[in-house]
């Protein structure tokens, strides 16, 4: 091989190496983006977890705001409200076990019987004023009254308003209604849950698929009524299932 041919070969090999390295870098970036896009439980709340481990005087109050209907409000068998057995406070109890130095507020802005359209109307006044560090939205169960389109519009409004304030957002799919077949994929409730899952993916935010968690538990041999206090409200055992799903982010 002559000197000229040798130089061409070396340059070609070098360019091949550069392109391969570039391709690897692009693939790595795409992989990183995909991890973030799915609201990965291991890292979505990383900045919040870093705050939760700080000790006085470096720590600050962390506000967890729960916006939704009667379930996060703590309604069991209406009109009985069992605040300390509902998932926001079961979550707080578990968080304090692993973050003993943290000051954590669980703030309820829920109203029993409310749907997402109603919740969106008071969102700025009743939710954003609490300056949430993490916002949980749980309206699917009651959104059957307003339909998919109105529900989506309302959820998107709240999501966008929260993200504009750099708030971490975690969406929750529905807890069960015993009048609805959990295994029927064509129900209005399942369609709403699917839409919520799509919104979480679209906006790269967190998702707790409570509906799927109940489906899996029942498919494994559980009895749905064992998790319910009335036809459409979970009992403490059902609330614990939701709290367990949220805890995976912490």
Language-model regions, residue ranges each:
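Extracytoplasmic/secreted envelope proteins and their assembly/folding machinery
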Residues: 88, 92, 120, 152-159, ...
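Structural beta-sheet core signal
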Residues: 66, 137, 171-172
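N-terminal export signals
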Residues: 2, 8-31
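Catalytic His-Asp segment of secreted/periplasmic serine-dependent ester chemistry enzymes
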Residues: 175-250
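A short acidic, helix-capping loop that chelates divalent metal ions and anchors anionic groups
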Residues: 73-77, 117, 143-146, 178-182
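Serine-esterase "nucleophile elbow" of acetyl-processing enzymes
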Residues: 35-109, 122-131
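Cell-envelope and extracellular/periplasmic
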Residues: 71, 79, 108-114, 136-144, ...
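Internal alpha/beta domain cores that form substrate/cofactor-binding pockets in large enzymes
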Residues: 63-65, 102-130, 143-169
């Amino acid at each position: 091989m002559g000197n000229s041919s040798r130089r061409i070969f070396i340059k070609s090999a070098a360019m091949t190496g550069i392109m391969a390295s570039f391709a690897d870098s692009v693939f790595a970036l795409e992989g990183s983006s995909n991890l973030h896009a799915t609201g990965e439980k291991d890292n979505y709340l990383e900045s919040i977890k870093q705050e939760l481990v700080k000790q006085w005087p470096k720590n600050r109050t962390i506000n967890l705001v729960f916006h939704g209907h009667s379930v996060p409000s703590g309604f069991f068998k209406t009109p009985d409200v069992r605040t300390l057995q509902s998932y926001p406070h079961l979550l707080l109890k578990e968080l304090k076990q692993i973050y003993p130095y943290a000051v954590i507020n669980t703030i309820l802005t829920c109203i029993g019987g409310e749907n997402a359209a109603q919740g969106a109307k008071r969102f700025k006044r009743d939710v954003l004023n609490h300056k949430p560090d993490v916002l949980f939205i749980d309206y699917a169960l009651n959104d059957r009254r307003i339909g998919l389109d109105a529900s989506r519009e309302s959820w998107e409004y709240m999501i966008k308003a929260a993200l504009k304030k750099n708030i971490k957002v975690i969406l929750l799919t529905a807890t069960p209604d015993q009048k609805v077949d959990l295994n029927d994929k064509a129900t209005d409730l399942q369609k709403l849950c699917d839409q919520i899952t799509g919104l979480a993916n679209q906006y790269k935010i967190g998702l707790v698929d409570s509906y799927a968690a109940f489906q899996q538990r029942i498919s494994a041999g559980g009895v749905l009524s064992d998790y319910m206090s009335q036809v459409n409200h979970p009992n403490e055992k059902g609330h614990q299932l939701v709290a367990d799903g949220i805890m995976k982010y912490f």
